[in-house]
Amino acid sequence: KELMGTSLYYSMDPFHEGGSTEGVDLAAAGKSILEAMKRANSSAVWVIQAWQANPRPQILDAIEAGDMLVLDLSSENRPMWGDKESPWYRENGYGKHDWLYCMLLNFGGNVGMYGRMDRVIDGFYAARELRKGTLCGVGITMEGIENNPVMYELLLELPWRPEKFTKEEWVEGYVKARYGCDDSRLRQVWQILSETVYNCPDIREGTVESVFCARPAEEVHSASSWGSSRMYYP
């Protein structure tokens, strides 16, 4: 506190990935959580993750605008901001609350090439148009780092681009910035990558898993309970 001052943002995720809400007054619980944060700092902002059933609508309704910041945790796969194509679609998104367009990308620290370039770009600009009053930035929410840096470069550049662009256009600039030269061979390689391994067409929990990491079985489909060993690119 002496070095950094009093914190402004406080994270709390009640009933995350389960937890029984039976008999719980969710509105009252939400208010109590925020009140505890306000005792530490009267300007405190509650940061909450949007994942599965969270944040509960009753809590969203009970908290005043400006007191909560929602992380749309996996905007590239299961957004809740109001994308009708999402399996976790919410018609009103997060209502009056500010939120961040986040990319989860990595699950469980698995290492491998993976991304959804088109989905990340299209989703961001659709969200900015539909929720321009509450969308206030982007976030990275990965469970592992030191892989797929191109995807983070792409995501973090989005807020700086007022006009929508294509991944093909962006990749050309990325190649020049990454290698410090304009080489047609490098552009070709990265265009191939952006159309295949970095443009996954479906929802999945990160990179393709190796069957050698799975438990022995006659048929192996994944190494983890959430992943997939099915290739999505040629």
Predicted segments, located by residue:
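Catalytic-core regions of glycoside hydrolase
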Residues: 1-194, 199-232
